[in-house]
A protein has these predicted regions:
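Extracellular beta-rich repeat passengers
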Residues: 1-201, 224
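Surface beta-loop-beta hairpin patches that serve as ligand-binding interfaces in beta-rich domains
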Residues: 178, 198-225
Length: 225
């Protein structure tokens, strides 16, 4: 659990070929005030086997142009002796805002046909993330799966929102030129989250649909009796 305001540098930085078995961001509120700051940066040959975000809000106070998570195309098999054969990416009840507005989110995180990857993404809100223009060219799901590797990703998706204020209609949960790279769960909530004041870091929800499904970081939801 943590609160970090105006993070100027990566929360976690590694420039060598080290690997973590797991990294969890839980019950955190983090604002980043520099567009080029990478949140988690493995700029060498490093890797995180299991990476999870839960009950957290991470947002840029200016449109973020950097990767949210950067790893240099490693896979579990690159770490001999680890015994790793699978990898997990999990996002549950999180709120993300203005991340990867230059078509960036994750890079080369799911990159190998010889590894098994699991993606669990549920009750999470992505607002103004991973879109580069008024017409939009990217999508959250596509960028996590590193376009073209969907076949070896075992994914569980439920009640996520992909809202883009600059896109006509407000939603673009996939790259229109890449039909595979979208949320096919049939559960995506295509209604504006209606944050109270996102520009000033208040992501309290007024959308009845999101409140009913308990979407996003719980800190922005009304308490239940």
């Amino acid at each position: 659990s943590c609160t970090i305001k105006d993070l100027p540098v990566p929360l976690y930085y590694c420039n060598n070929g080290y690997a973590l078995s797991s990294l969890s961001i839980t019950d955190c509120l983090v604002s980043i005030n520099t567009a080029s700051t990478i949140f988690i940066a493995f700029n060498g040959q490093g890797w995180i086997k299991d990476l999870s975000f839960s009950n957290s809000t991470i947002y840029y106070t200016v449109p973020g142009s950097a990767y949210f998570v950067q790893m240099r195309g490693r896979t579990p098999s690159n770490f001999s002796g680890s015994g790793w054969s699978t990898s997990l990416r999990k996002m549950s009840n999180c709120t993300f805002y203005q991340i990867g507005t230059n078509n960036r989110f994750f890079n080369n995180v799911i990159n190998s046909n010889s590894a098994v990857f699991f993606l669990e993404m549920q009750n999470t809100i992505f607002a103004d993330c991973v879109v580069s223009s008024a017409t939009g060219t990217e999508g959250v799901f596509r960028r996590i799966c590193n376009a073209g590797n969907y076949g070896n990703v075992n994914y569980t998706l439920g009640y996520n929102t992909y809202y883009y204020s600059a896109v006509p209609g407000g939603f673009l949960d996939y790259d229109t030129s890449d039909e595979n790279g979208r949320d096919h769960s049939g559960t995506a909530i295509k209604v504006e989250p209606k944050f109270v004041n996102a520009a000033n870091g208040d992501f309290t929800l007024s959308s009845s649909e999101h409140i009913a499904k308990r979407c996003g970081d719980p800190r922005w939801l009304p308490t239940t009796e």
